[in-house]
Structure formats: structure tokens, C-alpha cells
A protein has these predicted regions:
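Glycine- and small/polar-enriched repetitive beta-structure motifs of secreted/surface proteins
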Residues: 1-245, 252, 269-273, 325-333, ...
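Transmembrane beta-strand segments that form the barrel wall of outer-membrane beta-barrel proteins
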Residues: 159, 172, 312-321, 339-349
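Extended alpha-helical stalk/coiled-coil segments
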Residues: 266-294, 379, 383-393
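Outer-membrane beta-barrel transmembrane domain signature
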Residues: 291, 298-303, 321-323
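Outer-envelope beta-barrel architecture signal
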Residues: 309-315, 326-328, 338-340, 353-355
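Residues on the lipid-exposed face of transmembrane beta-strands in outer-membrane beta-barrel proteins
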Residues: 317-319, 330-334, 344-346, 357-361
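Structural signature of outer-membrane beta-barrel domains
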Residues: 322, 349-351, 362-364
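Repeated loop/turn-to-beta-strand initiation elements of outer-membrane beta-barrel proteins
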Residues: 338-344, 364-370
Length: 394
């Protein structure tokens, strides 16, 4: 049987519904109850609208406790904050003013027992979408998907089970157990942690924060049915306990396109290609150095073959060898007078045609000639002396 208790309350259809609140209304459903002023319930079973202007549409065991809170479908959800809302999902609690939860939560049978997965949107205008065991504590923070996401920072975002610290304002954690503990930090990938402001992290160091455990104290209250129950005390700050990583871990960026602009990332393939080119250039440079050194040795081996006072044209060949490289040089020397000499030398072959040239002139008075006859003169003198000796002996 339906019961109308509140002034101006209305019930339309349904069964076992109770309209306690003044000007409250129930339309259809079963075992629903309106307790707040101007509250309303449409369909569903076992729903309660305890907050002023609170409303529930369908679902089961949902509670619109906050002023202006709205719940649509789902099971066992609660809108505690003013103007908070929960749509779908199970066991979710929108606590902060204007907080919103869309789906997620739930109850899971692990094989031996049932485990309740509850999302809590405690920050003002915080949002949780399609996740489980999430806690959005920071005002304006958002948690999307995954499991166990925690956002302590203002206007921070967790995607796929990441976390943000209390100082991580406007930060983003993308990936399971990824996190940011600093302002404007971005963590990309599993267990990546941003620890320097404005940076992007792809891994973590030993000792970095690996997550946060958020626990609310309990308090005893009397519910709308007059029963005393223990519930989380959302009026007090929760106890936040950080955990840390024991070992460092660094993720790889895979399947990247080659960088084009000056500030693009470089792939391993590009590095290998650049290193190969550098090694090739080094090899060519070494070959060039070897050839140049051998050529200099060959040019240094060119010498004129003029006797003292001789004039004319002379040719010379020089050889040089250095680190497996051999060079040949050809030289020409021209002495038009006893005091002037021109010389020209060039390296031939192997495409490394080095050359040199020179001009020399003798200046100042000539030094006195030292008695240093040539071999022919000495032979002639000895022959003459021998003949003179024979004549004297006759």
C-alpha cells in the first residue's frame, strides 16, 4: 500500500511507496520513499529521495540525500553533495558539491566471496566515469576508466587507473599506476611518474610514489528510517598514505615515425643511420689522412742530384708509406745558374694529386772551395804519381 504523509505530497501508481516530504512526489515503482522537501522519485525499487529537491529516476536502492542531487538508474548509488549526480553503476557516492559519477563501481564475485567496488567523488565538481575503486578528492578533478584511480590535485586527471598528488594541479596520469606528484606533470604509460613540474614521464625511479591509499574515518548517524548506521565521515579530510616503488622502471616508446623537424623525437633507426654515416665519414677521413701523410712523405723524398756548381735540369722520384697507404711523387729541379734553383714536385695516382714548388737563390759571397776532389780526380792524381814513381825507378 502507498502512504501519503507529507503535506501536498503525491503518489501516482506503484506499490508500497511512501511520500514523507512536503510537496514530494512518487511516480510508479515499488518501496520508494521521498523524505526531502520537493523531492521526487520516478519508478525503480527501494529508492530514497532524502535531500531537498532531490530526485531519483529508476534503478534500485539509490539515495538522493543531497540538496538538488539526482540519481538515474543503477544500484545502491548515493548523491550526498548538493547538486551532485550519479547515473548508472553500483555502490557509487557523489559527495562533493556538483560532483558526478557515470557508471562504474559494482559488486564482484571472486570465487570465494563478493567484493564491492565503490567510487567516491568527494571533490567539488569532481567527475568519475566508468571505473571502480576510484577516489576523486581534488576539486574539479576527473577519473576516467581503469581501477583504483586517485586524484588529489585540483583539476587533475587520471585515465586508466592513474593517480595525482595533492600538489599535482592541472596534471595528467595516463595508464595503470601512472601518476604525477607535481604541477603540470604528465605521466604516460604503466607505472610512469612525473616528479618535475611541467615534464612528461615515461617511467619511474626507485623511491618514486607508486600510488595513494585513501581512507575516510567512520561516524555514526541516524538515517531517514530512524536507524543508526556507520558511514564514512566526508566532512573530515581523509587519511592519505603514499606507497613507493622499490626499483626503477623505464618504458619504451614504440612504433614511432621518424622525426622531421628540429624538435621532433629521433628513432633508434635514425640514430643507427646517423651513426653509420658518421662511421663512414670517419673511415673516409682516416683514408684521406693516410693518403695525405703518405703523399707528404713522398714529396719529402724528392731531392736534386746536382754536384757543386752544376747547372741544368734534373728529375727525381720519391716514395711514401703510411698506415697501409703508399704514394709516389715525381719532382723536377732546374738550375739555370750556380746560384738559382727552381723545383716542382707532384704526387701521382689514387686521385690525391698533391704538389709543391719552390725557388731558392744563393746570396752573399761564395765560401772558399775546400779541397775535396771528385773520385775521378783522385784516381788521375794517383795514376800520375804511380807513373812518376816508375820513371824514377828505371
Amino acid at each position: 500500500r502507498d502512504r501519503l504523509i507529507g503535506n501536498y505530497a503525491t503518489i501516482s501508481g506503484g506499490e508500497d511507496n511512501i511520500a514523507y516530504g512536503e510537496s514530494s512526489s512518487i511516480s510508479g515503482g515499488n518501496a520508494n520513499g521521498t523524505y526531502g522537501l520537493h523531492s521526487s522519485i520516478s519508478g525503480g525499487r527501494g529508492n530514497n529521495a532524502g535531500g531537498e529537491i532531490g530526485s531519483v529516476m529508476g534503478g534500485s536502492q539509490n539515495n538522493a540525500d543531497g540538496k538538488g542531487s539526482t540519481l538515474g538508474g543503477g544500484l545502491g548509488n548515493t548523491g550526498k553533495g548538493e547538486w551532485s549526480s550519479v547515473f548508472g553503476g553500483s555502490k557509487n557516492e557523489a559527495v562533493g558539491t556538483g560532483a558526478t559519477i557515470l557508471g562504474g563501481g559494482g559488486r564482484e564475485f571472486t570465487g570465494t566471496k563478493f567484493v564491492t567496488h565503490k567510487n567516491i567523488a568527494n571533490g567539488e565538481y569532481a567527475t568519475i566515469v566508468g571505473t571502480r575503486d576510484a577516489n576523486s578528492v581534488g576539486n574539479g578533478s576527473t577519473i576516467l576508466g581503469g581501477a583504483g584511480g586517485v586524484t588529489l590535485g585540483k583539476v587533475s586527471t587520471s585515465v586508466g587507473g592513474g593517480f595525482t598528488g595533492s600538489k599535482a594541479e592541472n596534471s595528467v596520469a595516463l595508464g595503470y599506476k601512472s601518476g604525477s606528484v607535481v604541477k603540470y606533470g604528465t605521466a604516460l604509460g604503466h607505472e610512469s611518474v612525473a616528479t618535475e613540474e611541467g615534464t612528461i614521464a615515461f617511467g619511474h625511479d626507485a623511491g618514486d610514489v607508486s600510488g595513494y591509499k585513501v581512507v575516510y574515518q567512520k561516524k555514526e548517524i541516524t538515517n531517514h528510517l530512524g536507524n543508526k548506521v556507520w558511514v564514512p565521515d566526508y566532512d573530515k579530510d581523509p587519511t592519505v598514505t603514499p606507497t613507493t616503488f622499490d626499483k626503477a622502471k623505464y618504458n619504451r616508446l614504440v612504433k614511432l615515425a621518424d622525426g622531421i623537424d628540429a624538435h621532433d623525437a629521433v628513432t633508434v633507426g635514425q640514430l643507427e643511420s646517423a651513426i653509420g654515416e658518421l662511421q663512414s665519414a670517419g673511415t673516409k677521413l682516416q683514408t684521406t689522412v693516410n693518403q695525405a701523410t703518405a703523399s707528404s712523405y713522398a714529396l719529402a723524398g724528392l731531392h736534386p742530384n746536382f754536384s757543386e756548381g752544376e747547372t741544368g735540369l734534373g728529375l727525381s722520384v720519391g716514395f711514401g708509406h703510411y698506415h697501409g697507404t703508399t704514394a709516389i711523387a715525381l719532382g723536377a729541379f732546374y738550375r739555370p745558374t750556380r746560384n738559382i734553383q727552381w723545383n716542382l714536385g707532384t704526387v701521382i695516382g689514387k686521385g690525391n694529386q698533391g704538389f709543391n714548388g719552390g725557388f731558392s737563390i744563393k746570396v752573399g759571397p761564395e765560401s772558399k772551395k775546400v779541397a775535396n776532389e771528385s773520385m775521378e780526380a783522385r784516381i788521375a792524381i794517383r795514376t800520375t804519381n804511380f807513373r812518376i814513381g816508375e820513371s824514377l825507378n828505371k
